[in-house]
Amino acid sequence: MAQETNQTPGPMLCSTGCGFYGNPRTNGMCSVCYKEHLQRQQNSGRMSPMGTASGSNSPTSDSASVQRADAGLNNCEGAAGSTSEKSRNVPVAALPVTQQMTEMSISREDKITTPKTEVSEPVVTQPSPSVSQPSSSQSEEKAPELPKPKKNRCFMCRKKVGLTGFDCRCGNLFCGLHRYSDKHNCPYDYKAEAAAKIRKENPVVVAEKIQRI
């Protein structure tokens, strides 16, 4: 008999049918289902007093809110009417300076934009003769100068020498007989040229003076 009484009962499933094992302490439900059950009870307990309170106070609160809204609208309409009448009765001198300035600037802009736009006729400019003159002078300057004919006659006897002529330092062309300076009385000064050349090639050497102590 003692053995039969000590035997523990077998595991029982959750009463909600979730498939987990239940516990007799949690009304035969598992821990998860029991927590959900408690949360539902708490939520239902909170909602019920709020619903009753709102149901009892709804008619009076609605009527009071409607009356307040009507009074607010009446006050707004009265204030708007008074402000409009005041604005109509305010003289021009009482307006702020900034508003007067803006009105003056707008009127000036209207006056500037209103004048009729005159159609401007196209102006045709004709080239003046003074402009063409420099171009003609420039063209004349750019024209190549004609080469001077080369001298091919002797300056003394006027004999044709061709390529066998001799140029003198005086700038003339002579034949074989008159190429010497004494034959054609050459005006070029050979002595002065030679003296200048000698001075250039042989500068004067002067010793430095001895400074006495």
UniProtKB/Swiss-Prot annotation:
GO BP: any one term: vasculature development
Modified residues (N6-acetyllysine): 209
Tissues with expression: Expressed in brain, muscle, eye, and heart, lower expression in lung, kidney, and spleen, and very low expression in liver. Expressed in myoblast C2C12 cells (at protein level).
Ligand binding (Zn(2+) 3): 168, 170, 184, 186
Superkingdom: Eukaryota
UniProt keyword list: Acetylation, Cytoplasm, Metal-binding, Phosphoprotein, Ubl conjugation pathway, Zinc, Zinc-finger
Ranges of biased composition (kind: Polar residues): 40-66
Classification via SUPFAM superfamilies: AN1-like Zinc finger, Glucocorticoid receptor-like (DNA-binding domain)
Region listing for Disordered, in residue ranges: 39-149
Protein name (record): AN1-type zinc finger protein 5
Originating organism: Mus musculus
